[in-house]
């Protein structure tokens, strides 16, 4: 029975991984844009971004899934518009929910890294005659390198968050596990297999991300040894 269950549940791995990659790509670029806006000296823009961050970091991801998937269908004008073509697609809604949620947390990470940039680097850019936008274009990539260890954890959280996609009919790892449980009622074995798959994938991803961190943050070790 174990092998039969495993052969069914592993069918959801490609969907879970694809959801993770697509969501992270959207979230990363959105977070970069929002970090840029937060670093500008405009209180209205900063207030709007902070409202978005509060909404998506202050509410459960599961609630966001249901609001994005079921919410638009409450408005006839959305149903009659071209938007309904994508908003009625469960896969798109799952990717959107994950992306918006991850972008909020990633923005906090990136903006924190920007604020942690030594004052001397800001002053150096100012001494070169660079304006605020030009300075941010130079310093944000540096800040992203410093934020990588924390962002690695966000990548893992997004992958594990894909398990919620099964609640809106997506056949990912948990989707196949839930379907299998509906016919076999062997919760311990079925969900144990699903949990094991998540554990193995997150373990591999963690090892790869740690190696990436060592390469990307090598400049810090060089600076320390040089000092």
UniProtKB/Swiss-Prot annotation:
Protein name per the record: Arginine ABC transporter permease protein ArtM
Membrane topology note: Multi-pass membrane protein
GO BP, one annotated term: amino acid transport
Membrane-spanning segments: 17-37, 51-71, 78-98, 155-175, 188-208
Pfam families hit by this protein: BPD_transp_1
Task performed by this protein: Part of the ABC transporter complex ArtPIQM involved in arginine transport. Probably responsible for the translocation of the substrate across the membrane.
Family: Belongs to the binding-protein-dependent transport system permease family. HisMQ subfamily.
Keywords for the protein's UniProt record, in alphabetical order: Amino-acid transport, Cell inner membrane, Cell membrane, Membrane, Transmembrane, Transmembrane helix, Transport
InterPro entries named in the record: AA_ABC_transptr_permease_3TM (IPR010065), ArtM/GltK/GlnP/TcyL/YhdX-like (IPR043429), MetI-like (IPR000515), MetI-like_sf (IPR035906)
Domain of life: Bacteria
């Amino acid at each position: 029975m174990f092998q039969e269950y495993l052969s069914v549940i592993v069918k959801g791995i490609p969907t879970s991984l694809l959801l993770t990659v697509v969501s992270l790509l959207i979230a990363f670029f959105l977070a970069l844009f929002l970090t840029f806006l937060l670093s500008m000296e405009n209180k209205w823009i900063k207030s709007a971004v902070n409202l978005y961050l509060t909404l998506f970091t202050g509410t459960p991801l599961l609630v966001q899934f249901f609001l994005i998937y079921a919410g638009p269908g409450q408005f006839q004008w959305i149903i009659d518009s071209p938007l309904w073509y994508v908003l009625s697609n469960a896969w798109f809604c799952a990717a959107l929910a994950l992306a918006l949620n991850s972008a909020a947390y990633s923005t906090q990470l990136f903006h924190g890294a920007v604020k942690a940039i030594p004052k001397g680097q800001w002053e150096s850019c100012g001494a070169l005659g660079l304006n605020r936008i030009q300075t941010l274009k130079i310093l944000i990539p540096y800040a992203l390198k410093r934020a990588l260890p924390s962002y690695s954890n966000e990548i893992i959280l997004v992958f594990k968050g894909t398990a919620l996609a099964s609640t809106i009919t997506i056949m990912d790892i948990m989707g196949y596990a839930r379907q299998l449980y509906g016919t076999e009622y062997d919760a311990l074995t079925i969900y144990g297999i699903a949990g094991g798959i998540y554990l193995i994938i997150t373990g591999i991803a963690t090892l790869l991300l740690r190696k990436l961190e060592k390469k990307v943050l090598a400049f810090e070790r060089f600076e320390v040894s040089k000092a």
